[in-house]
Amino acid sequence: MELFHHIKSVRDALGKARAAGKTVGFVPTMGNLHNAHLALVQQAKQHCDVVIVSIFVNRLQFGLNEDWDKYPRTLQDDAAKLREIGCDYLFCPEEGEVYPNGMDAQTRVIVPSMANVLCGASRPGHFEGVTTVVTKLFNIVQPDIAVFGIKDYQQLAIIRRMVEDLCIPVEIMAGDIVREADGLAMSSRNGFITAQERPRANQLNQSLNWVKQAILDGRRDFDVLESEAKKQIETAGFRPDYLSISNSKTLEPAANDDTDITVLGAMYTEAARLIDNVSLSVVN
């Protein structure tokens, strides 16, 4: 596996790969890799000749009171994991390489219809930071395929919309959620869950699945279902951020006649904010 810190090195290596007729798969990450990240890399390997992973803790997508400075930097371990599963290239730029003119002067990419709801409502500017850095990474790597995890469903939907709107020639693939044995979605932020909270930390997943089953059983009182699910989370000792029954494509509140629905939620533990989602198809 080759390790790059500079854009020119990435472009040179991938240019040679393309000249040899190879397809390029890309998995952008912020590092602190776990099995869910590695599954995305393996998925990219199944569909492309060479795979590049980026590790960049993007300060532009963190809010003022968020955990950018606390986000784990584990490059040595991450590189070892990627090398073990056969990743071809690892791109780890410094902030000045990605934002040479500084973040305040950086041109921004915004998906206005989807970025200010759900996670975007409680994390203003977050998705603007995501779409800006992903656009830059797409321009650097120019992948044939990019793989994003379904756990970050809103991010996935926004990236798909951005690629469509800006005519970016990349296929976006979705990687399934990887879960712990009790249903908790794997996340780098799970390390902030306390030992006392951990046995109850799967409550968000349980409440989302409870809503899913209720809809499949015929309930269409979506507002009531959302409120009841939030109460379940509160009863378990956590603070719900949001729980929304949404149209899977637009992320707008689901209508009674929608057939593709995603139930998304976020909750706060003592020191972490966890997100999760479940999707379902409804026959009306």
Swiss-Prot record:
Pfam families noted in UniProt: Pantoate_ligase
Gene3D superfamilies: HUPs (3.40.50.620), Pantoate-beta-alanine ligase, C-terminal domain (3.30.1300.10)
A biological process term (GO) from this entry: pantothenate biosynthetic process
Residues that bind beta-alanine: Q61
Enzyme Commission numbers on file: 6.3.2.1
Entry binding sites for ATP: 30-37, 149-152, 178, 186-189
Secretion signal span: none
Pathway it works in: Cofactor biosynthesis; (R)-pantothenate biosynthesis; (R)-pantothenate from (R)-pantoate and beta-alanine: step 1/1
UniProt xrefs under InterPro entries: Cyt_trans-like, Pantoate_ligase, Pantoate_ligase_C, Rossmann-like_a/b/a_fold
HAMAP family named among the record's database cross-references: PanC (MF_00158)
Function comment: Catalyzes the condensation of pantoate with beta-alanine in an ATP-dependent reaction via a pantoyl-adenylate intermediate.
PANTHER family hit by this protein: CYTIDYLATE KINASE/PANTOATE-BETA-ALANINE LIGASE (PTHR21299), PANTOATE--BETA-ALANINE LIGASE (PTHR21299:SF1)
Protein name, entry field: Pantothenate synthetase
Organism: Saccharophagus degradans (strain 2-40 / ATCC 43961 / DSM 17024)
Gene from which the chain derives: panC
